[in-house]
Amino acid sequence: MVGNQIIGGMIRKAGGFSFQELNLTVDDIASMSKGGAYLSYDFITRPAYHHAVLTGNTEFLRLMLRTVHEYGIDPASLIHALQNHDELTLELVHFWTLHASTPYTFHGQTLPGAVLREHIRETMYENLSGEHAPYNLRFVTNGIACTSASVAAAALGLRDLTVLTDADIERIKRVHLLMVMFNAFQPGVVAVSGWDLVGALPLPAEAVAERMVDGDTRWIQRGAYDLADVAPDTPVSAEGVPRAVALYGSLTQQLADPASFASRLKHMFSVRQAYGIAASRQLPIPDVLTPSLLIMMHELPAGRGIQITALNFVPDPLEEIIVLEHVPPGPVVDMLN
């Protein structure tokens, strides 16, 4: 902790900028936010929003969002990310160490943190790997090697990625966009990888067998991609990594199509920037009646009003009345349309 604060202070004195990506308890992330790195990687809600995608239930996600508030962490100080070069970690350190005995309410039961952790992990492993999704692989004992697109495929119950139809790809894209919206329509930094932009699928394990001899299954999620169609017919990168199947195509192709994944992202990010959502202040997370619903409310900068992010984690339409306390009446604007 002290080392983090010293390094952060030295970087600030040099006019630099820093962030830390240690997978820590919420207690430690809160402590580091006071005098340490400017930003912390959001290991708090990252496993939780994937859990919501896979189960269609936002209860654990709401629990973790409220935990952020409980510990006085400003969501604007977090880097909310989609896929990166590492596995989707399911370590859930917060419930493993300091809060193994702390009671939590989940699905109507009171569970110690250690039991809640194992329940979440078992659900994630079952839904995101093994028989249900054989294209994703466990990484050692605390995570799963996967891509954002393969998370979406698993959530949709698609077992064989070699026989995807155009309709399947469109459904994967919609789930992928849901994940982007959760991360982008809240305060803080949103991080999207090149693998996300092209809709990369995991490589077959045999394609990177030599790189996985030490058990590092993460190589299946690190397939090569070509954002600008520089070498569209090249099957292997200059470093010898096989090209991943890109469900959405290159950026060059996508930006010519207003309905493509990248074009939809471009629109989302323009809305995020226009309204100053990154610098907004998140209000308490409301209760909901429908398990698949998540509501986040944000006070926009410069008194521009209250922004509401309403996300449905299942494909079925829903209707619910939410009472917004302490929100002044005013005109309602659909920011995306």
Where are these regions (language model features)?
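Active-site-proximal helices and loops of the catalytic beta/alpha 8
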Residues: 1-82, 93-108, 199-231
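Acidic/polar loop patches that form or flank catalytic/metal-binding clefts of enzymes
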Residues: 12-21, 190-194, 276-283, 330-334
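Catalytic cores of nucleotide-enabled group-transfer and carboxylate-activating enzymes in metabolic
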Residues: 16-21, 297-300, 305, 322
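Short, surface-exposed beta-strand/loop "edge" segments at domain boundaries and coil↔beta transitions
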Residues: 49-51, 303-306, 337
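Loop/helix patches that line or flank the sugar-binding groove of alpha-linked glycan CAZymes
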Residues: 72, 78-79, 83-307, 313-317
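C-terminal beta-sandwich/jelly-roll accessory domains of carbohydrate-active enzymes
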Residues: 313-337
